[in-house]
A protein has these predicted regions:
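Extracellular/periplasmic carbohydrate-active domains that bind, remodel
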Residues: 1-170
């Protein structure tokens, strides 16, 4: 049948279509190191660790076209102990997005994203430099951002919410 890969805002649950895949995804992994590599032109989010812990992402470059929708840079979701440092990120959406599940799925999993440090990163272009939410139904706790440069982003640091989604930022 006709199956189509769509941008997130075009996806309709239950229809015969699918979201485009992230470039790199980890799921329920521990002790992850992503270091010194470059990424460009992902079909969707670039790096998306989910339900993982002890993650270090350092010295990477992400360069995605400014007109490409849903091409976030780094999107930890329901992760613990994440250190992102010395990264250069230019994207068509948000540079770094802290997530913890969407709506009922996030509330049911009840896994917060916590203990996140973001240091010495350069974020050029994109909607937001560091964004918390809006997919944060499982809560977000203890985020530290230091010595980062936001140049050409619509906003540097943003907390994004959505009515009815739920979630707490501490």
């Amino acid at each position: 049948e006709n199956e189509t890969l769509l941008a997130k805002n075009q996806y309709i649950k239950g229809k015969n279509n699918f979201l485009r895949p992230p470039m790199i995804t980890t799921y329920e992994c521990k002790n992850i190191l992503i270091e010194g590599v470059s990424f460009s032109n992902p079909p969707f989010w670039t790096i998306m660790p989910a339900f993982s812990e002890n993650i270090t992402i350092t010295g990477i470059t992400i360069e995605n076209p400014g007109n490409s929708p849903n091409t976030d840079g780094i999107d930890p979701s329901s992760c613990r102990n994440v250190h992102i440092s010395d990264c250069h990120i230019t994207v068509g959406d948000d540079c770094i997005v802290i997530k913890s599940g969407r709506d009922e799925d996030g509330r049911e999993a009840a896994r917060p994203t916590e203990n996140i440090t973001i240091t010495n990163c350069t974020m050029l272009e994109g909607h937001g430099g560091v964004v918390i939410g809006s997919e944060m139904s499982g809560d977000v706790k203890r985020i530290s951002i230091a010595n980062c440069v936001f140049e050409g982003t619509d906003i540097g640091i943003r907390i994004k919410t959505m009515r009815g989604r739920g979630g707490v930022v501490e």
